[in-house]
From Swiss-Prot:
Binding site for FAD: G15, A16, G17, L18, A19, G20
EC numbers: 2.1.1.74
Record-level GO BP terms: tRNA methylation; tRNA wobble uridine modification
Subcellular location: Cytoplasm
Cited PANTHER family: GLUCOSE INHIBITED DIVISION PROTEIN A, METHYLENETETRAHYDROFOLATE--TRNA-(URACIL-5-)-METHYLTRANSFERASE TRMFO
Keyword annotations from UniProtKB, A to Z: Cytoplasm, FAD, Flavoprotein, Methyltransferase, NAD, NADP, Transferase, tRNA processing
Cofactor(s) of this protein: FAD
Name of the featured protein: Methylenetetrahydrofolate--tRNA-(uracil-5-)-methyltransferase TrmFO
High-level lineage: Bacteria, Pseudomonadati, Thermodesulfobacteriota, Desulfuromonadia, Desulfuromonadales
One Pfam family this sequence matches: GIDA
Role summary: Catalyzes the folate-dependent formation of 5-methyl-uridine at position 54 (M-5-U54) in all tRNAs.
GO molecular function: flavin adenine dinucleotide binding; tRNA (uracil(54)-C5)-methyltransferase activity, 5,10-methylenetetrahydrofolate-dependent
Catalytic activity: uridine(54) in tRNA + (6R)-5,10-methylene-5,6,7,8-tetrahydrofolate + NADH + H(+) = 5-methyluridine(54) in tRNA + (6S)-5,6,7,8-tetrahydrofolate + NAD(+); uridine(54) in tRNA + (6R)-5,10-methylene-5,6,7,8-tetrahydrofolate + NADPH + H(+) = 5-methyluridine(54) in tRNA + (6S)-5,6,7,8-tetrahydrofolate + NADP(+)
Length: 459
């Protein structure tokens, strides 16, 4: 796929987030000229702050790094396929126990610089308010698709957009944390002292939960229907589900004994390193849509955070996605108009890694169509194939966003295995089955050594 410059096919991509950037990178690597449209800095969504591409607006964690977690398997697949996403993640990683977390600013800057420097990618910083009437297009406008573009996408897909809120967790300056109360440790001592832990007694916890239940929230727009995705549930919504929901969820204390007592507290608030210099820590699982004054008031009641300085307070934003099983084919093409591809969270995948994976595939599929080189589907036994299976084979009547998980993978044949053994066997099968597909589709990428299977400790 190396046509001369005058013969080079052209691809338009709308949206330069994780999916759009990865799609552009892959298509350009296969000799396609790409025009990548990004509305920042001309226009910002309610959740974005940086002019850089591929901005991480929720957590800075890319989740579990080991093979015992399906997202760890998917990351290794993307690593073996030489994705820009994994190059950036590995280059900007920060300590996070058994998870892979990144310095969010360095990560976005890495991707931005590589996109800007690629000779076949033209970055145009303007808001696309409609879809080009001609040519091959990838829509990767993300969960925060602009109000101007959304009606055009609704018309294209012939379906209503569904809205729910992804809530963003606060970030705290490390030197404002009281370490006479808080301490550093990872759960069960795995992965080093990568988390800061703030303990709560039963009375402190119950008071905290009650405060969350009665706190003022930011009101959503009248036309937005609130459908919360379980993986990014606001902490105040979890508190309303039951007094002990948080204690068995993001505030679970098991494996985190307080060094002052030697015993597990009743509940624990964990903070995870957010930048390379370890000056910023985000509150794990504390996505929220509380008003800013309420966040300061309530979160400063947490022992160890009484003097906390917030580098960023939590916020909420809309998530827009299409009914992929009804609208798209297996190659992420719009069934009613095969020149149109969709990629990223707007398709109904959920999470940073999944969005990048979807962009990776869309870029390959679009480039293949443009150059008359059909790109085969990845094996269903891989994380990549499992994601495509979710988008194409789920029931269209109750389709919802989904993180990658081993439940999406085909079951193993043969004898029954324990859960941990079964997951590792699925990962080994995925990486084994990926290789012939990778060699066929990405022949310019050299063979890589096997990746060791490890357990994950993603909190």
């Amino acid at each position: 796929m190396n046509p001369t410059h005058s013969q080079q096919p052209h691809l338009t991509i709308i949206g330069a987030g994780l999916a759009g950037c990865e799609a552009a990178w892959q298509a350009a690597a296969l000799g396609v000229q790409v025009t990548l449209h990004e509305m920042k800095p001309t226009s910002f969504s309610p959740a974005h702050q940086s002019a850089d591409l591929a901005e991480l607006v929720c957590s800075n964690s890319l989740r579990g790094a080991g093979m015992n977690n399906a997202v760890g398997c998917l990351k290794e697949e993307l690593r073996r396929c030489a994705t820009l996403f994994m190059q950036a993640a590995d280059a900007t990683a920060v300590p996070a126990g058994g998870a892979l977390a990144v310095d969010r600013d360095a990560f976005s800057r890495y991707i931005t610089e590589h996109i800007e420097q690629h000779p076949l990618i033209t970055l145009q910083r303007n808001e696309q308010c409609s879809v080009p009437p001609e040519g091959t297009v990838i829509i990767a406008s993300g969960p925060l698709t602009s109000d101007a573009l959304a009606p055009h996408l609704a018309q294209l897909t012939g379906s209503r957009h569904l809205y729910f809120y992804d809530a963003i967790a606060p970030i705290i300056e490390a030197d404002s944390i009281d370490f006479s109360i808080a301490w550093k440790a990872s759960r069960y001592g795995r992965g080093g002292d990568d988390y800061i832990n703030c303990p709560m007694s039963r009375d402190e916890y119950m008071t905290f939960v009650e405060a969350l239940k009665t706190a003022d929230k930011v009101a959503g727009k009248d036309f937005e229907k609130v459908i919360h995705f379980e993986g990014c549930m606001p902490i105040e919504e979890m508190a309303r589900r039951g007094d002990m929901t948080l204690a068995f969820g993001p505030m679970k204390p098991v494996g985190l004994p307080d060094p002052r007592t030697g015993k597990d507290p009743f509940a624990v608030v964990q903070l995870r390193q957010d930048n390379l210099h370890a000056t910023l820590f985000n509150m794990v699982g504390f996505q929220t849509k509380l008003t800013y004054p309420e966040q300061r008031r309530i979160f400063r009641t947490i022992p160890g955070l009484q003097d906390a300085r917030f580098a960023r307070l939590g916020s909420m934003h809309r998530n827009t996605f299409i009914n992929a099983p009804r609208c798209l084919d297996q190659h992420l093409r719009l069934t009613s108009d095969p020149r149109m591809f969709f990629a990223g969270q707007i398709t109904g995948v959920e999470g940073y890694v999944e969005s990048a994976a979807c962009g990776f595939l869309a870029g390959l599929f679009a480039a293949g169509q443009l150059t008359d080189h059909a790109v085969p589907l990845p094996p269903a036994t891989t994380g990549l194939g499992a994601l495509l299976g979710h988008l194409s084979h789920s029931s269209p009547d109750d389709f919802q966003p989904m993180n990658v998980n081993y439940g999406l993978f085909p079951p193993l044949e043969g004898r029954k295995r324990k859960r941990s053994e079964r997951r590792l066997a699925m990962a080994e099968r995925a990486l084994r089955d990926l290789e012939p597909w990778r060699q066929r589709v990405l022949s310019h990428i050299p063979d890589l050594k096997p990746f060791p299977a490890e357990d994950s400790d993603d909190v």
